[in-house]
Curated annotation (Swiss-Prot):
The gene is ndhA. This is NAD(P)H-quinone oxidoreductase subunit 1, chloroplastic. NDH is composed of at least 16 different subunits, 5 of which are encoded in the nucleus. It comes from Cucumis sativus. Its EC number is 7.1.1.-. Belongs to the complex I subunit 1 family. The chain crosses the membrane at residues 28-48, 98-118, 127-147, 248-268, 300-320, 343-363. It comes from the Eukaryota. Keywords: Chloroplast, Membrane, NAD, NADP, Plastid, Plastoquinone, Quinone, Thylakoid, Translocase, Transmembrane, Transmembrane helix. The lineage of its organism: Eukaryota, Viridiplantae, Streptophyta, Embryophyta, Tracheophyta. It catalyses: a plastoquinone + NADH + (n+1) H(+)(in) = a plastoquinol + NAD(+) + n H(+)(out); a plastoquinone + NADPH + (n+1) H(+)(in) = a plastoquinol + NADP(+) + n H(+)(out). Its main location: plastid.
Amino acid sequence: MIIDTSQVQDIHSFSRLEFLKEFYGILWVLVPILTTVLGITIGVLVIVWLEREISAGIQQRIGPEYAGPLGVLQALADGTKLLFKENLLPSRGDTRLFSIGPSIAVISILLSYSVIPFGYRLVLADLPIGVFLWIAISSVAPIGLLMSGYGSNNKYSFLGGLRAAAQSISYEIPLTLCVLSISLLSNSSSTVDIVEAQSKYGFWGWNLWRQPIGFVIFLISSLAECERLPFDLPEAEEELVAGYQTEYSGIKFGLFYVASYLNLLVSSLFVTVLYLGGWDISIPYILGYELFEINKVYEVFGMTISIFITLAKTYLFLFISIATRWTLPRLRIDQLLNLGWKFLLPISLGNLLLTTSFQLFSL
């Protein structure tokens, strides 16, 4: 069989087209992921700057002002400094656990962002079990902290890891029960469906008004999960030096630093999605997202507005978290566990029973 030159050229052009098709297919998958990662990184940098400025205002002192205008580049300067610091390893510790621990903490939190709707039609994975996938993934992070504490071969680090695991278990259950109540009210566990269920009734349809007890419990539990004051027992400086972070330096210490703010941001986003209506502005006749389906310009404008609304609600909760840090004193470990097991757990169970009864009688 003889193949002429034109047929060979056709075969080569076809193979090039197939390669370009596969390349653009991979690129189409990577672009949303990379965009989300970039947005999360910028969000964390903004949180660090806001915390320093708000903390300085509460304490009546001057915050960061030299790294960039108004000190906006201070977090970037700190990260660069940690990047070039030496990574020290404990001489008698388990270096494998010591090195893997920070990575597990960061990766488990980053995966949680895949189910968060940042705006109208802006979610990486709209899964039917979105909120419970977040709870399942976030429960992996304390394992990384416990590995870090054990691998450090330091009594303060090990106690900090144990405290982190105990605290996470104590407050994960009330938080899960609150999420289950929201899922029952919305008849779905998808984060997108939960937001759309709230948007049907406007401002008064927010789960903040329908689940006020659950909102307070979720707020307290999320602060405890983020290990923020008054719940920062795993790294209490006066008792444990720095807890599970005591033996860390350089980029590994920076990973814990990033993980704490990533966790704070993801908790704030879930407060917005579950209780504050998500991307919906909740003002009738002002912003109807069905109008944005007319053409691409309206669609992009609608997505931009929805992202802005989501972030505005999220950073409002972040302000409350930062102000709480400098308002309330740290609890003792027995007070922390008693609050979770003897107070929040029974109330969250009662709230779930009331929600279930309401849903059954409304059928």
